[in-house]
UniProtKB/Swiss-Prot annotation:
Protein name from the UniProt record: Transmembrane protein 184C
Membrane topology: Multi-pass membrane protein
Ranges of compositional bias, category Basic and acidic residues: 425-438
GO molecular function list: transmembrane transporter activity
Region Disordered, residue ranges: 355-438
């Protein structure tokens, strides 16, 4: 009987292969952990590391299984690429925290890598939303300009609102993108300060660098999440088919909880709740605070893996008729050309704005109103409302983005607007034709 394990039917054997590899890893890792416990005197530090390792072994397979399913059913790259990047956050966080818990001396280095990936996740979530909208609604700027003016949320409610349309879209994307620049920059500064001995992580004092970097990171992160929230508020109806609330909460909770619990632990050290009287096997109080943070993250990531399994499910992308290469799906996961293009676009937009040449609005605010322009304006807005009120896609498929769009079933605002425009011009010409005939 010929072997069926060929590259053409890789979907059938890739999942059993991953399961076998994971089981072998468990068989090797568990004895090593037991041997480590027997070799050392078991204390609080070692017990915490062992318990965190149990949660790590529970977390990794859940996350990797969802990632693998997305690779197997990689039918809509525009959406699944950012989803896969977001899903990698849980195993990276969990493994990073477990290593830092075991080796406190290198915690500063592995934790900074984890925090950089946090910014990367926020950027990819914004990319996930914009990719869906631009594929389903090609004239997204047109839709934004037709909407009512959105005011800022507190505490920015006193600031003038951003103009609807391209300005709002650009500033929301730029607000998220700035965090992906600020966070790696502050991470490099933190590493330099650690080498110079002036970082002093976990100690709230204006004589060290850690306090200032925490403030900068916090402000940048809050503004990025604010831009995400404002973007969702404006396009809530258009985003409803992909159920973004659960996805937004998953990203927001992981990012905010990990950050603020570090701040709370640092405050406990500052007020003396965590003191030098009980450092266990750690050398300093700050090392105790960092170890406690890493231990809690290992537990939280198990819960986050379960939440990601349901909120970022692969099931809407299952299309058995779609065949793809195993290597193409795997390599696409590491492709970052979209990030390069997005950064280039934002830089060009900033350059146009600085030079005073922004793009013209599709709906000018100051224009002479007459019967013809009013009719065209109302017709265009009707076209937008028609496209925006399209029924949600059937279960199991997200219609309207990627290569699943079919012109016969998914009309775009551009086509509808052209049809209305041609009909309007035709009606305008009818009286003149009749006068000629008479």
């Amino acid at each position: 009987m010929p072997c069926t394990c060929t590259w053409r039917n890789w979907r059938q054997w890739i999942r059993p292969l991953v399961a076998v590899i994971y089981l072998v890893s468990i068989v090797v890792a568990v004895p090593l952990c037991v041997w480590e416990l027997q070799k050392l005197e078991v204390g609080i530090h070692t017990k915490a590391w062992f318990i965190a390792g149990i949660f790590l072994l529970l977390t990794i397979p859940i996350s990797l299984w969802v990632i693998l399913q997305h690779l197997v059913h990689y039918t809509q790259p525009e959406l699944q690429k950012p989803i896969i990047r977001i899903l990698w956050m849980v195993p990276i966080y969990s493994l990073d925290s477990w290593i830092a818990l075991k080796y406190p001396g290198i915690a500063i280095y592995v934790d900074t890598c984890r925090e950089c990936y946090e910014a990367y996740v926020i950027y990819n979530f914004m990319g996930f939303l914009t990719n869906y909208l631009t594929n389903r609604y090609p004239n997204l700027v047109l839709i934004l300009e037709a909407k009512d003016q959105q005011k800022h949320f507190p505490p920015l409610c006193c600031c003038p609102p951003w103009a609807m349309g391209e300005v709002l879209l650009f500033r929301c994307k730029l607000g998220v993108l700035q965090y992906t620049v600020v966070r790696p920059f502050t991470t490099i500064v933190a590493l330099i300060c650690e080498l110079l001995g002036i970082y002093d992580e976990g100690n709230f004092s204006f004589s060290n660098a850690w306090t200032y970097l925490v403030i900068i990171n916090n402000m940048s992160q809050l503004f990025a999440m604010y831009c995400l929230l404002l973007f969702y508020k404006v396009l809530k109806e258009e985003l409803s088919p992909i159920q973004p609330v659960g996805k937004f909460l998953c990203v927001k909770l992981v990012v905010f909880v990990s950050f603020w619990q570090a701040v709370v632990i640092a405050l406990l050290v500052k007020v003396g709740v965590i003191s030098e009287k009980h450092t266990w096997e750690w050398q300093t109080v700050e090392a105790v605070a960092t170890g406690l943070q890493d231990f809690i993250i290992c537990i939280e990531m198990f819960l986050a893996a379960i939440a990601h399994h349901y909120t970022f499910s692969y099931k809407p992308y299952v299309q058995e008729a779609e065949e793809g290469s195993c290597f193409d799906s795997f390599l696409a996961m590491w492709d970052v050309s979209d990030i390069r293009d997005d950064i280039s676009e934002q830089v060009r937009h900033v350059g146009r704005t600085v030079r005073g040449h922004p793009r013209k609005k599709l709906f000018p605010e100051d224009q002479d109103q007459n019967e013809h322009t009013s009719l065209l304006s109302s017709s265009s807005q009707d076209a937008i409302s028609i496209a925006s009120s399209m029924p949600p896609s059937p279960m199991g498929h997200y219609q309207g983005f990627g290569h699943t769009v079919t012109p016969q079933t998914t009309p775009t605002t551009a086509k509808i607007s052209d049809e209305i425009l041609s009909d309007t011009i035709g009606e305008k010409k009818e009286p003149s034709d009749k006068s000629v005939d008479s």
